[in-house]
Amino acid sequence: MKTITLRPGQMTLADLRHIYQHPVHITLDESAYVPIQQSVDCVQAILAEQRTAYGINTGFGLLASTRIATEDLENLQRSIVLSHAAGVGEANDDAIVRLIMVLKINSLARGFSGIRLEVIQALITLVNAGVYPHIPLKGSVGASGDLAPLAHMSLLLLGEGKARYQGEWLPAHTALAQAGLQPLTLAAKEGLALLNGTQVSAAYALRGLFEAEDLYAAASVFGCLTVDAALGSRSPFDARIHAVRGQRGQIDAASTYRHLLGERSEISESHKNCDKVQDPYSLRCQPQVMGACLGQIRQAAEVLAIESNAVSDNPLVFAEQGDVLSGGNFHAEPVAMAADNLALALAEVGSLSECRISLMMDKHMSQLPPFLVENGGVNSGFMIAQVTAAALTSENKGLAFPASVDSIPTSANQEDHVSMAPRAGKRLWEMAENVRNILAIEWLAACQGLDLRKGLRTSAILEPARQLLRQHVTYYDKDRFFAPDIEVASQLIAQRHMNELMPAKLLPSL
């Protein structure tokens, strides 16, 4: 198990990808201790001076003008956790919960939240022990923070709710015991600090980012396999074409295709003197389309990297000046828009792949047997697999509608504009699954097309992708039950083998 030392505000996307994909051991760098304690001291000074400060000794939301008596402050913090734990739906899986918890730890440890080191260390202990609180998928609108899901996370610290340990749901007290912890009593400001923040929105979008990167890599590889299967030209990937336009994503995408296709292969040499002038757009314009998608992925990654290191609590404690300021860092609009950009990229990656699949079905376009099968008529080949790809592509067009343009007022109109960032991030998972299956069909089709070229080999870099599939799925010499082959190919894509074929540093978290 990898140990990751958190230096608050310095987590990388590579760290976050690892935390999402693997159990980890977290330690907190000692440089965080002083700022954390200073923020706690500032809160205590405000209480000692009997100053009124939102979130410390007042109610919340529309009840912010209600002053809370000192003897009720601990009960206030417990009450906010209990009352706000109102999420619904299935539980998030362990990977997402682990990512949420580490994002919350990273934010609290910046020292602007007025929360004790003891509470932060309790969250770290839970992560290290593999004890994951029950956090429902639904219930947040992404402002004021991800209140409901983070309240469910915080219930466990109070000895309430339930948690999963080694795949089994346990009552909170039992789960805490597995980590060697006792229930905590939260002090002033701490309940609100735990609940307020964009960590759930960010975690949902980060999963979408990681899947978008993996699928971008797979689509690049399979797009090149299709170029060779359809006897496409390499000339559209010439660096000079892309340099004169100047779009960075396009330039990098074209470079990737040159890397994958190589200068020549048996297949490319077999048709280099053919009389075909231009390929269809789904082959020829891959750098332009995929380059634009790469730009969206990179832009979203930049936003999410910043947000993953952000302080999105409210109010914020500025201990050096002794100030507690109310603002709106809990509003997850940047995350929502980043997720919307990822949705556009995913939709287009899948759409372009479906176009290439359709091209291979057409004997006039691909110079391959109709539907990629011999003895057509008796055999239908890939006919309906292409229909499935079309159905999934259409689904993603609907799912790509921006979530960030929606808003519903909440909290008696005190919180009258919200981001819908959790929805923006969560729908990426469904889109990614659709794209994965579209790409699985293209992979199957491209390898079938290559096999129909009577053994001509593609490039040295692409051949391992072809061979990997053929280790699990055999050539279609006649019709057979098709769905299991799509599932096998999809699972292989999910194992991220195609990332290994990509140029270094092309994608932000790899």
From Swiss-Prot:
Gene3D superfamilies, per database record: Fumarase/aspartase (Central domain), Fumarase/aspartase (N-terminal domain)
One Gene Ontology MF term: histidine ammonia-lyase activity
Reactions catalysed according to its record: L-histidine = trans-urocanate + NH4(+)
Disulphide bonds in the chain: none
EC assignment: 4.3.1.3
Residues in cross-link 5-imidazolinone (Ala-Gly): 143-145
2,3-didehydroalanine (Ser) PTM positions: 144
Any one GO CC term of the record: cytoplasm
InterPro entries for this protein: Aromatic_Lyase (IPR001106), Fumarase/histidase_N (IPR024083), HutH (IPR005921), L-Aspartase-like (IPR008948), Phe/His_NH3-lyase_AS (IPR022313)
Post-translational modification: Contains an active site 4-methylidene-imidazol-5-one (MIO), which is formed autocatalytically by cyclization and dehydration of residues Ala-Ser-Gly.
Keywords: Cytoplasm, Histidine metabolism, Lyase
Compartments where found: Cytoplasm
CDD domains from the UniProt entry: PAL-HAL (cd00332)
Pathway(s) of this molecule: Amino-acid degradation; L-histidine degradation into L-glutamate; N-formimidoyl-L-glutamate from L-histidine: step 1/3
Keyword presence, Zinc-finger: no
Source organism superkingdom: Bacteria
GO BP, sorted A to Z: L-histidine catabolic process; L-histidine catabolic process to glutamate and formamide; L-histidine catabolic process to glutamate and formate
Entry similarity comment: Belongs to the PAL/histidase family.
PANTHER family: HISTIDINE AMMONIA-LYASE
Protein name (database record): Histidine ammonia-lyase
Gene behind the chain: hutH
